[in-house]
Amino acid sequence: MSGTKWTEEQLSAITTRDCNLLVAAAAGSGKTAVLVERIIKIITNEENPIDIDKLLVVTFTSAAAAEMRERIANAISKKLDETPTSKNLQKQLTLLNRSNIMTIHSFCLGVIKNNFHKIDLDPSFRICDQTEGILLKMEIIDELFDDKYDEENQEFIKFIEAFSSYKSDNALKELVLSLYNFIMAGPWPKKWLKAASEDFDIKTLQELDESKWVSVLKESIKIELDGYIKMMQKAVELINETDGLEPYFEGFSSELDLIVNAYNNVESSLNDLYNSLNLITFNRLKTIKKNTVSDENIQNLVKQIRDQVKKKISALIEGTFIATPDKMLDNIIKSYPYINQLTELTSEFIDRFNAKKKEKNILDFNDLEHLCLKILIEDNEENQIVPSTIAQKFKDYFEEVLVDEYQDSNNVQEAIIELVSRKNSDNPNVFMVGDVKQSIYKFRQAKPELFIDKYNSYSLDKGINRKIQLYKNFRSREEVINGVNYIFKSVMSKTVGELEYTDVEALNLGASYPKKKNVDDIIGGPIEVHILDRSDNKEENDESKLQAEEEEIGDVNLEARIIVKRINDLISKKDGSKFKVLDKDTGEYRDLKYKDIVILLRATKNWSEVLLDELGLAGIPVYADTGSGYFESIEIRTIMSLLKVIDNPMQDVPMLSLLISPIIGLSAEELTDIRLIDKEKYFYENIIKISTEKLISEELQEKCEYILSSIDKWRRKSIYMPIDEFIWYLYMDTAYYGYVGAMPNGVLRQANLKILFQRARQFSETSFKGLFNFINFINKLTKSSGDMGSAKILGENEDVVRIMSIHKSKGLEFPVVFLAGCGKNFNLMDLNNKILYHEELGLGPEYINLENRTSITTLPKEAIKKRMKLETLSEEMRVLYVAFTRAKEKLIITGAVRNAEKSIEKWINSAVLDKDVILPYEISKGKSYLDWIGMALCKHKDGKILRKKLGFSSEMCKDDLSMWKISIWNKYELDMYDELDENQEELDVKISILDKDVNKKVKSEVYRRLGYEYEFKESTKLTSNISVSDLKRRNMNDNIDTLEIFDLEEEDNKNKDVITPKFLQEKKGISSAERGTAIHFAMKKIDFSKVGTLKEIKEQLNKLYEEEFILQEEYSSINPYKILSFFKSNLGKKMLDVYNKGGKIYREIPFHTEISSLELDESLPQKYANEKIRLQGIIDCFFKCDDEIILLDYKTDYVENEEEFKEKYKSQLLYYSEAVFKMTGKKVNKRYLYSFYLEKEILI
């Protein structure tokens, strides 16, 4: 790293010592490189080198820790190459294996393992996985509520009546579990519960006035009133500047004074504030004669401003002061018993859960942090953070504690860091690096306030608490940088965003992009904003066009089509010019590839599926890493329905799903016949009746008998088989695993079924057993823990457009970023829950009056609601910042609005209130990313299209370097990839003519067709598709005289790409075929630039496992040495040589071709010579070397005789050679088998 040219600020972050140091590192500023270089400098200091194991480096994820170790190892190795005799470097490389570079959970686990005796813990404890943890919580919460019902405690019963639905108490159970998860992110969960309950033990208005809730309410009211004052002041200013508006002046000024008076009373008592707000009145405006005003747009604007202020002040009074202060106090007092019950229930749940875990000798991830705290704190009873002897040893041992991604820390982690470091001493040693603008994990209880407090209090100058700012961005083009700065200077503030985005925080250009060499090439360019207008406004002459396009295309589809159009434009311009991006390896511009493009979404649910469809229809290769959709996939729903029927067949919904599925395959008519037997009975009862009584056709009776016998067989097996074995048995017995493999996306569907099997295996290893418990667990997982996401079957180097959530994109970068769905409203649904909770403000319930069954919000709930809303919007602001800063060269924003004209009017009304920024109050009222972006762009010179729509001039524009291109699309004018077939009209005419005399001919035609006998009956025995592998197997069998008829279910089960997981016990391992498929998959995905050493290959295999491309058994079955041997062989070296020279290596190439049916069965008559069979297969590898095409097929078989081995696969390689010729037009010159068993290449 010595060759790196560091900036002054980076160098300061690397070399500054003897203080607590906070490094505020903006997106793309080289944060990780700086952290690694700091560590290298510390451990290689010539005067005072510090051993690497005396540093504690805390990372956010295990993957980040592994990457950090790898970077440090590479840096040390590089230095060793320069000075190979350095004993210190050799020592550090050795110590790296035991260094403390880890997540906070890993550190806590180590502390617990070494000090288990201090907390009365059995040293043989294990960490329970998520599955077992969820099941235990479900069991304990049910037991807790059952016991409470048995106690017949009236306070508990009232609590249940008040906050449960009329159907069940599930919502309350979820509330207790949710509150438990929330408070466990704090260091003292029980103390928090106790304090939250005591907050409601107030008796007087004075106590209420002094509460933190009122303080928050006043803060919120102040922000709102300040916004209204600014709005009215702007209106008065416009009145003064516009001829003819003088009659408005007195009324506006009077109303402004009343609002100012209320603002001045905000800090007074609750009663005084209530009264001053109710004094604000709006009288009727004086009339102004027509045609006397110089600018009617201004007149309309000031009236709109006044109307808005009037409505908002009314809403403020009704929303905040839902009653008089006396009545609000009364509601708090009456809510106290409910809050007391909730906190007691949650506290008891903690005790029971801990007791159950102790009984089973297990810990969960929350325990790791809290037990670690218990070990590190001397006296835990008073909840005082007094370091224990063990904590003091850590303080003495660690020379420096370095925390990566500090903006995502929580209070527990902060306490642990303080206890093991010298942070609060005269000799501080904590290094913290992160970017608070990228703190987007509030839902995991991250506390960006920890970073912000230090950022605001630490000094830029010398001292024991210092900060350094890294705001030079080495990622993005100037167009992107300027756009990011313009938007966030306009909209980010301490109110919304929790940080003022000033010139200090702004990104500075650090990346160097060369000028283009070809004048026709397109590089960079303005940030694009595409606004889809969803309104029904249309020109009169559009009526016919509207009727022609009367298809119900959703708004998401239309937005997707805008994206499709822009992708196609970027990939291939109609005028021949091409969009270019900089190749980071060559430093030259190259054509944009699909893999350079990402589509980012705030949430992928309901969006990714549509985008996949629309891009797929347009021929654009695309992949969505959704993190959802797993439980909604047809294959998982079908298997879950099957399991539910086996558990309890008296369930019509899963039974119907099973009956229409391919497993049973009843038709709609058959289902109707079953239903009509007795509409009052369950389907299962009617099936029993049909099978025992001859009520319907013999065929349906036989089917019903089959259904009953199958269910009975499955139910008997479910009793004694472990759930994972049972599920795999069902896959095989029903042939469903093979069936889904033959469906579109079959590889993905089978991989999804494998995941369910693996989940069942995890479940079977817990203390919970049985089909019922597994179904209950999956149901709970679906509802409370979110979707698992479909299986991953795509590597990072595939040339496809990627769709992902903004959260998943954090830390990544892409040449072209589409930020889609920006018109979607923020999700504020949680604010409507009956009881809210907040770390600082405690609990906020609704007050439920059981006598008249009414509910009303309380002052604590309103205070928490207002704070949570601002915090949620601040989080959304930071999420938007993360999305913007993923783009390297091009940023394209899309979003839909209900009515463009009304939206733009709203944006302009917000934008005109201040000449520099959008007022925080206006930002807080924004409902989407597009609202924020639109407000800012209304003030930009490139926002002319927005201002023009409402007739506004450019006087409100700001000077700015950023460049924007704004387009507004009307939903009825969007003409992309949906043109009607040119021949459709002609076809309709022909059909209508045919319809006129169809009745005359239909009878005789029906009889003719029913009596028809097919001339080529023998060909019906032929399969329409066959794989090369099957063809090879048939050719090997000399005794087959006629074509063997293969079972379709057996054929469906064959899939070369998917490893079939066996339910056999672990000691039996995976089969040879599975091992072979695993090696093939590894050879498909492996990066040829990192295969020089055994370590590099191991790291790549480990990455495939960590990213869930291969399972544990598959990972363990692959011998990395065998792969290294291939790359050390002559053939492997030749392949790498081609790759290193920029040649193309074609891997895992599927093909389809046709062969004569006589090649399959020579006994067929000659008339079948023209009957074609579709031959399909997958070519492992081929490449061009020295003007020769070389074909390679990997084999993992046991080889006894090499000649027989060659003969066995000779025909297969001939078919592959023919396929390569058809694809490339070039003959294969050399065909090789590579035997991993022999570690040898064999020329065929």
Curated annotation (Swiss-Prot):
Molecular function GO terms recorded: 3'-5' DNA helicase activity; 3'-5' exonuclease activity; ATP binding; ATP hydrolysis activity; double-stranded DNA binding
Cofactors: Mg(2+)
Catalytic reaction annotation: Couples ATP hydrolysis with the unwinding of duplex DNA by translocating in the 3'-5' direction; ATP + H2O = ADP + phosphate + H(+)
Keyword Nucleotide-binding in record: yes
Domain spans labelled UvrD-like helicase C-terminal: 517-811
PROSITE patterns in UniProt: UVRD_HELICASE_ATP_BIND, UVRD_HELICASE_CTER
Taxonomy, superkingdom: Bacteria
UniProt entry tagged with the keyword Mitochondrion: no
Keywords, comma-separated and alphabetical: ATP-binding, DNA damage, DNA repair, DNA-binding, Exonuclease, Helicase, Hydrolase, Isomerase, Nuclease, Nucleotide-binding
GO cellular component terms attached to this protein's record: cytosol; DNA helicase complex
Listed InterPro entries: AddA, DNA_helicase_UvrD-like_C, DNA_helicase_UvrD/REP, P-loop_NTPase, PDDEXK-like_dom_sf, PDDEXK_AddAB-type, Restrct_endonuc-II-like, UvrD-like_ATP-bd
Residues annotated to bind ATP: A25, A26, A27, G28, S29, G30, K31, T32
Ranges for domain UvrD-like helicase ATP-binding: 4-477
An individual GO BP term: double-strand break repair via homologous recombination
Gene3D superfamilies per the UniProt record, alphabetical: 3.90.320.10, P-loop containing nucleotide triphosphate hydrolases
EC number, as in UniProt: 3.1.-.-, 5.6.2.4
Quaternary structure (record): Heterodimer of AddA and AddB/RexB.
The family this protein is said to belong to: Belongs to the helicase family. AddA subfamily.
Function text: The heterodimer acts as both an ATP-dependent DNA helicase and an ATP-dependent, dual-direction single-stranded exonuclease. Recognizes the chi site generating a DNA molecule suitable for the initiation of homologous recombination. The AddA nuclease domain is required for chi fragment generation; this subunit has the helicase and 3' -> 5' nuclease activities.
Protein name per the record: ATP-dependent helicase/nuclease subunit A
Species of provenance: Clostridium botulinum (strain Alaska E43 / Type E3)
Organism taxonomic ancestry: Bacteria, Bacillati, Bacillota, Clostridia, Eubacteriales
